[in-house]
C-alpha cells in the first residue's frame, strides 16, 4: 500500500502486537515522547472529567528568599527556590480509598536507582500505608518505554536493602516480578487505576 504521494507505507512493528507477561492487547500506543508526569496528568484529567476519581499532583514547595514591595498593596518575589518535597507526588480519592503515590522515570535500561527516593518520602508512604491507604510507585523505564506499578509493600524490602547498603538499585526483573505492568492505550493514556484495582484486591487478600 502507498501513501497519496507515492511513498510506501511501512508498519511500525514495535507498536503492533506488543504483549508483556500475558497481556493480550493488540495495540500498544507507547509513550510517544511524553514524560511520565504528562501521561499521568492526562489520565487524571480523564478520571476527573468522568467522575471516576479525584487525583492531583501536589504542588512543589517554594522557599521565598527575597520580596520587593513597590507598593503597600503589592509584593514582587525577586528570589525563590524550589524545596525538596516532603511527601509524594500525587494523592487523591478513588472509590472511597485514599491513594498516595510517587512517580519516577529513569534512563537506566536495567535497574531503578534508589537514590531517586528520599527517606522522608518513604516515611510518608509508610505512614499512609499504616492507615490502610493504597500506596505505590509508578516507575517508567524510558529506554524500554515500559511503566510499572510497584506496591509500597513490595518496595519496602528494596528500600531496607538500600538502607543497609546491600544494594543501591532495583533491577528491572525484580520490578517485573514484584510489580504490575501498565500498558499504554488511547484513553486514558495510562490507565493505572485498572492496575490499582488489582492491587487493592491482592492486598485485601494478603491482609486477611
UniProtKB/Swiss-Prot annotation:
Compartments in which it is found: Cytoplasm
HAMAP family: RecU
One GO cellular component term noted in the UniProt record for this chain: cytoplasm
Chain positions of site Transition state stabilizer: 104
GO molecular function, one term: endonuclease activity
Similarity comment text for this entry: Belongs to the RecU family.
Record-listed Mg(2+) binding positions: 87, 89, 102, 121
Disulfide bonds: none
Location of the region described as Disordered in the Swiss-Prot/TrEMBL record: 1-30
Cofactor note: Binds 1 Mg(2+) ion per subunit.
Required cofactor(s): Mg(2+)
UniProt function note: Endonuclease that resolves Holliday junction intermediates in genetic recombination. Cleaves mobile four-strand junctions by introducing symmetrical nicks in paired strands. Promotes annealing of linear ssDNA with homologous dsDNA. Required for DNA repair, homologous recombination and chromosome segregation.
EC number(s) reported in the record: 3.1.21.10
Single biological process term from Gene Ontology: DNA recombination
UniProt entry tagged with the keyword Protein transport: no
Record keywords: Cytoplasm, DNA damage, DNA recombination, DNA repair, Endonuclease, Hydrolase, Magnesium, Metal-binding, Nuclease
Protein name, UniProt field: Holliday junction resolvase RecU
Record's catalysed reaction(s): Endonucleolytic cleavage at a junction such as a reciprocal single-stranded crossover between two homologous DNA duplexes (Holliday junction)
